[in-house]
Amino acid sequence: MSPFQSLLWTGSQLRLLDQRSLPQETQYRYYDTAAGVAQAIQDMVVRGAPAIGVAAAFGLVLTSQQSAMTDSADLRAQLAIAAETLKAARPTAVNLAWAVDRMLAAIANPDLEAAAIHATLLAAAQQLYDEDVAVNRQIGLNAQALIPQQANVIHHCNTGALATVDYGTALGIIRIAHEQGKQIHAYLDETRPRLQGANLSAFELQAYGVPHTVIVDGASGFLMRQQQIDCCLVGCDRVTANGDVANKIGTYNLALAAKAHGVPFYVACPISTIDRSLATGAEIEIEERDGREITEIRGQAIAPAGTKTWNPAFDITPAELVTAIITERGILYPPYGQALEQVLINPG
């Protein structure tokens, strides 16, 4: 396991590492209600598509454990309300809704009594937790076929252990390459406006001893022109049926720069991030956040009072800019419509 854990179930509470305070301070916060977990997701105490899905799963466990309902129908109604609250916390990441729906499916049997619902939900949440570690590690192992023995890569946002239960997706690829003895150097986009690259990815890679350099988001194209970059590695929050990718704002710009310079652009994600119910990225709901994330840094104003802002948290990268999608079931190549359908049908 990593030297830090983004989330941990204590037996009665969900402990979250408050990522807003990193790297300056390591603070843990404890939650005992689904509403509290939903607020933590919205406030980005915990972030990253896989991590918020697992956090939401334990949010339902908390609702069940604290419920005074002895009638199973009443308990299910209470859980349904909590589920909608959790899903609404961050609408772009499909893993959040996927994890909540999987939890509800686990208790779909109408014959389950209240006590059995409690036990089933806890087991289902723990299974999600354990699966996430195994899935992320497999993504990292599968990707090594694309990473040369000596590699310079560009990474956007944070997709490591802090964004998941452990290892992570795109950053996990870098971590595993380093563990395997590859000479890998990561250039980390700082990732405005919340600086997940500078604050979180640099924090992780420093802990693992992986050589890295932080760059401003606008420097990636010039960096590709100035020196050899072997690939760009990003995670994602949703992949649509045609292979369009929703990821942290700035991903689209990076993909355009990579295309212009002939640099492979790889997206790493678990199968749970694939949403074939949406035909293209145009159908994805994009979360817009408070403009103060742009006009302030850690509470300090950096723009004139009253400045207008537009602050989408994510953007859409068209499938034609994506060289490959790396999953726990293998590496997918265009045409993505066919590849995504096949990987969902055939687990092997």
UniProtKB/Swiss-Prot annotation:
Keywords, sorted A to Z: Amino-acid biosynthesis, Isomerase, Methionine biosynthesis
Keyword Zinc appears in the UniProt entry: no
Annotated catalysed reactions: 5-(methylsulfanyl)-alpha-D-ribose 1-phosphate = 5-(methylsulfanyl)-D-ribulose 1-phosphate
This protein's pathway: Amino-acid biosynthesis; L-methionine biosynthesis via salvage pathway; L-methionine from S-methyl-5-thio-alpha-D-ribose 1-phosphate: step 1/6
InterPro entries, per the entry: IF-2B-related, IF-M1Pi, IF_2B-like_C, Initiation_fac_2B_a/b/d, M1Pi_N, NagB/RpiA_transferase-like
SS bond partners: none
One Pfam family in the UniProt entry: IF-2B
Active site per database record: 237
Gene Ontology biological-process entries: L-methionine salvage from methylthioadenosine
Site feature Transition state stabilizer, where: 157
Keyword NADP: no
Its EC number(s): 5.3.1.23
Binding-site positions, substrate: 47-49, 90, 196, 247-248
One GO molecular-function entry: S-methyl-5-thioribose-1-phosphate isomerase activity
Biological function: Catalyzes the interconversion of methylthioribose-1-phosphate (MTR-1-P) into methylthioribulose-1-phosphate (MTRu-1-P).
UniProt cross-references to NCBIfam families, sorted A to Z: eIF-2B_rel, PRK05720.1, salvage_mtnA
Family per record: Belongs to the eIF-2B alpha/beta/delta subunits family. MtnA subfamily.
Protein name: Methylthioribose-1-phosphate isomerase
Gene label: mtnA
